[in-house]
Curated annotation (Swiss-Prot):
<comment type="pathway">
    <text>Pyrimidine metabolism; UMP biosynthesis via de novo pathway; (S)-dihydroorotate from bicarbonate: step 3/3.</text>
</comment>
<dbReference type="GO" id="GO:0008270">
    <property type="term" value="F:zinc ion binding"/>
</dbReference>
<dbReference type="InterPro" id="IPR050138">
    <property type="entry name" value="DHOase/Allantoinase_Hydrolase"/>
</dbReference>
<feature type="binding site">
    <location>
        <position position="233"/>
    </location>
    <ligand>
        <name>Zn(2+) 2</name>
    </ligand>
</feature>
<feature type="binding site">
    <location>
        <position position="306"/>
    </location>
    <ligand>
        <name>Zn(2+) 1</name>
    </ligand>
</feature>
<feature type="binding site">
    <location>
        <begin position="324"/>
        <end position="325"/>
    </location>
    <ligand>
        <name>substrate</name>
    </ligand>
</feature>
<protein>
    <recommendedName>
        <fullName>Dihydroorotase</fullName>
        <ecNumber>3.5.2.3</ecNumber>
    </recommendedName>
</protein>
<keyword id="KW-0665">Pyrimidine biosynthesis</keyword>
<dbReference type="GO" id="GO:0006145">
    <property type="term" value="P:purine nucleobase catabolic process"/>
</dbReference>
<keyword id="KW-0378">Hydrolase</keyword>
<comment type="similarity">
    <text>Belongs to the metallo-dependent hydrolases superfamily. DHOase family. Class I DHOase subfamily.</text>
</comment>
<dbReference type="GO" id="GO:0004151">
    <property type="term" value="F:dihydroorotase activity"/>
</dbReference>
<dbReference type="InterPro" id="IPR004722">
    <property type="entry name" value="DHOase"/>
</dbReference>
<feature type="binding site">
    <location>
        <position position="55"/>
    </location>
    <ligand>
        <name>Zn(2+) 1</name>
    </ligand>
</feature>
<dbReference type="GO" id="GO:0004038">
    <property type="term" value="F:allantoinase activity"/>
</dbReference>
<feature type="binding site">
    <location>
        <position position="174"/>
    </location>
    <ligand>
        <name>Zn(2+) 2</name>
    </ligand>
</feature>
<feature type="active site">
    <location>
        <position position="306"/>
    </location>
</feature>
Amino acid sequence: MILIRNVRLVDARGERGPADVLIGEGRILSLEGGEAKQVVDGTGCFLAPGFLDLHAHLREPGEEVKEDLFSGLLAAVRGGYTDLVSMPNTKPPVDTPEAVRALKEKAKALGLARLHPAAALTEKQEGKTLTPAGLLREAGAVLLTDDGRTNEDAGVLAAGLLMAAPLGLPVAVHAEDAGLRRNGVMNDGPLADLLGLPGNPPEAEAARIARDLEVLRYALRRSPATPRLHVQHLSTKRGLELVREAKRAGLPVTAEATPHHLTLTEEALRTFDPLFKVAPPLRGEEDREALLEGLLDGTLDAIATDHAPHTLAEKEKDLLRAPFGIPSLEVAFPLLYTELHLKRGFPLQRLVELFTDGPRRVLGLPPLHLEEGAEASLVLLSPKERPVDPSAFASKARYSPWAGWVLGGWPVLTLVAGRIVHEALK
């Protein structure tokens, strides 16, 4: 038995408390206390349901020098995540039931965050032949995506949506038009021109979202089941407007935004620092503000990290040669708690929802609330501030564009079904 005493409760339904949360047999037994072997003083802290990340690259199999299941899932629980969806763009890609099962079994044995593998939409993520979605779902895949690559063939995407619909699997898309994106390394515009860097235009995202929404309309018309499209790492004002319009029209589309697109802009590239190189690129302030509005009005369903670790040697190459990607599993919530909630008054209830029930809805999972009988997958968060120290990361990617930023809202206790998997109470 574990008792978390005198703690404020925050979930998608609101804030309340203080409460004395008694945990046993993997569940919340009471919000009014009781006898327990381990007592945690939650004074000044708040308790939330465990977070779910819809989008993380754990690099296993094939690139374990960058990250592996142990380091990635340990980073996850340190960040308050009890559940995580791993992307399939590994070496080789996760495109078979055997590969999905192998990941799930290894992750389960580690006893950290629960892994929910995404499987490739097409074999080898080549965009040609669809993978066996039914068998992948039976093996434990929770969505289909060729993330890391763009879906250039609209017919293949349509067939994938039609295949996934009766299985209840969402199809997630990296929405960029490859012909427009080309070799861009930052947002296309006056700053890219000034710096002499190739630009990736916002129209590349908007054009692909517009096309994919039309493909979704077709699949919806042709399928007796409901196809579900999920737009990954949305980064532009126009892309957001397209998703908003589609939702108002009743299309079954969901979307996510990342911590980096919510807190950073293209201005970070003025120093040519490759730590800020990411795909899609950091955009302008107008785009960032639009994303924040999208979080509030429900256009965006979830905050997803797009945790993308590389070796420091790779990220220290010049901006043209360094790989795309930012690691953020361990800082995502403190970053947004500080930058959005504390500094801008963003509602804490809504912020927690974007880390919990929002991503759960994308996957078709039931909500997880703080109530008697609920699964005790929980995170205790402290408002105490401290600077981001990448040298202390569990992730193998021990660097960060937010290094030195002073943040509050750090996870100090993470439980998965009643088991403590991370503790930093002192």
